[in-house]
Amino acid sequence: MKIFREVFELGNKEIILETGGMARQADGSVTVSCGNNIVLVTTVVKKSVADGTDFFPLSVHYLEKTYAAGKIPGGFLRREGRPSEEQILISRLIDRSIRPSFPDGFFNEIQIVATVLSYDGAFSPDILALIGASASLAISGAPYDDVVAGVRVGYTNGKYILNPNKQDLRDSDLDLVVSGTDDAILMVESEANSLPESVMLGGILYAHKHLKTIINSINRLAKVASKPRMEYSIYQINKFLKSQIKSQFFGEIKNAYTIASKQERNLKLNAIRKNVLEYIFSSDVDGNEYTEKEILEAFHDIEKDLVRSNILEGKPRIDGRCTETIRPINVKIGVLPGVHGSALFTRGETQALVVTTLGSDRDAQLVESLDGIEKCRYMLHYNFPPYSVGECGMVGMAPKRREIGHANLAKRATQAVFPNEEAYPYVVRVVSEILESNGSSSMATVCGSSLSMMDAGVPIAEPVAGIAMGLIKDGAKYAVLSDILGDEDHLGDMDFKVAGTRYGVTALQMDIKIKGISREILEQALEQARVGRLHILGIMNEVIKEHKEAVSDVAPQIHVMNINPAKIKDVVGRGGATVKGIVEKTGAQIDTSDSGEVKVFAKDKKSMDMAVAMIEEIVAEVEEGQVYKGKIVKLLDSGVFVNLLGSQDGYLPFSEIEQAGMKTNSLVEGQGLEVLVQNIDRGGRVKLSLVAR
């Protein structure tokens, strides 16, 4: 067994790449170690293309094993189940980073599995998994020429931090992951605290500068441990077939792409496709027999060339806009009367109905990870039904990876403005229903989430808007597009989503289909996005620019009380009897903590006020010199104990009763008396006198 090893430093941390010791039957197998973190990443490449495959079937699976953190999984089976949302998001991050590095037309299936074997809690293993995926590909024999690496960057007190640990990130205004090759940036994922575009750009360039060390180390490992380059074929469009279709139908295709409406344009294009198929099948074009798939792919290539060349030549985009114009926007709030908050955000042919629901602590999501169980107070879910694009499909299934990814992006974009628990004790769930989609549905979700939460009375710090930027690039010529359509995303070279407030960026997500982009393009895209974002915020602010002061009449009420911690036992009562009685009488939900915090959550204000009043009565402190109406709770030889407030009793001597002209032999338990608190000694004992009738 021959083991090869490479060691390099990243942010003053030693990282070790090793191959030859584990999973040797995989085409590529690398362990990546940093401290006590170890991730095993394997790559398997199919040696032939499956019949009918017309895409690149790359799949990435990031898996966390609970034994890595010395834990046993929860649940009845006590074993790992389906991957968590966080694991799916990391799988997507790796996929998006490495996918652009494969040649166009390479359709062999590749499966990458990254397994966390050991975890120390200091660092997230995601960057190690990304580095390991690139390294395992580099030694697998797959056509992976442009080696990719990735790093995480933080930003604290005006300084960038390379490879920050989890504690660093808690204090950081930025959580940025950048991946790329030696000379190009391929993928960006970030969450930020309303940082200026200049800081975001600086972070991206700072990250890219540090990729070279990792790439060099991977290349050295591949030089000594790589398998021979596999034999493979590249699928190519038949140029003669393409020219024949173009000569006969280009005018019709060109006219179709002047139709602004997506539905009308698609109807026209479908009719042209039908005519193209009939023409090719009924004529002997070049003596060859072509499949429907080959014909439609050639047709699609003509569409792609047309749209791209029009934009690069300065002609109007598909819907008639110039490169910087934003589609018409319509904003409505409070569209659903029975919910706590709602907004309908429409931008061109993309529409999101976003609904906010308020809940109590008990509604918080409990998320299990290698770090333990975390309580999530803010949830955002994104649904993309097939009717949103005029199609039939599966409905009511578990969310797909894309839906999970879009929800996470929208949540990250709005997380920076979401109030902390001390300022706002509600748990919040936001759901985005995409009703129509023609590009930028995730950014419509960002805008709709901001509007919906403000409608629900959630005190977000600032409204947030998002915009998707695109890129068409051919050699040195390029055009950056604001607010891209679905076709521009599909036919273009970049999908760059930017979200933020009027002050700065809260989230970035960039995916590149070409071999990377330059600083100049990034700068232009960020500036164009800033202008577009401010335009969108201006329209949103005309409808609502700050949160409503009160929650909806149909929303639950919540009240937080801070009482003397010693009084918590009085609120709870023996065996919980007191608090159960309050809950039964009022219908409220009551949560207490040893710190003295009491949360009252009720379906309406009446129930809440009743519960609060009952608790206040229990915890109220008796004061000297005050008169109280109490009841006798115990008779003694020398006096009586009178209950004043809650569990607080006072002692009333017979001498005080007789002095007030009342006979002591007539007293009974449960009898009401009006008494004055004479004094309270250091031990908390209360002495009473009877108020004369």
From Swiss-Prot:
EC number: 2.7.7.8
Keywords: Cytoplasm, Magnesium, Metal-binding, Nucleotidyltransferase, RNA-binding, Transferase
Names of required cofactors: Mg(2+)
UniProt GO cellular component terms: cytosol
GO annotation, biological process: mRNA catabolic process; RNA processing
Catalyzed reactions: RNA(n+1) + phosphate = RNA(n) + a ribonucleoside 5'-diphosphate
Domain KH: 556-615
Stretches assigned to the S1 motif domain: 625-693
Keyword match Metal-binding: yes
Presence of keyword ATP-binding: no
Binding site for Mg(2+): D489, D495
EC class (word): transferase
GO-annotated molecular function: 3'-5'-RNA exonuclease activity; magnesium ion binding; polyribonucleotide nucleotidyltransferase activity; RNA binding
Superkingdom assignment: Bacteria
SMART domains: KH, S1
Location(s) in or outside the cell: Cytoplasm
Subunit structure: Component of the RNA degradosome, which is a multiprotein complex involved in RNA processing and mRNA degradation.
Family statement: Belongs to the polyribonucleotide nucleotidyltransferase family.
Stored PANTHER family: POLYRIBONUCLEOTIDE NUCLEOTIDYLTRANSFERASE, POLYRIBONUCLEOTIDE NUCLEOTIDYLTRANSFERASE 1, MITOCHONDRIAL
Function text: Involved in mRNA degradation. Catalyzes the phosphorolysis of single-stranded polyribonucleotides processively in the 3'- to 5'-direction.
Name assigned to this protein: Polyribonucleotide nucleotidyltransferase
The organism of origin for this protein: Francisella tularensis subsp. mediasiatica (strain FSC147)
Originating gene: pnp
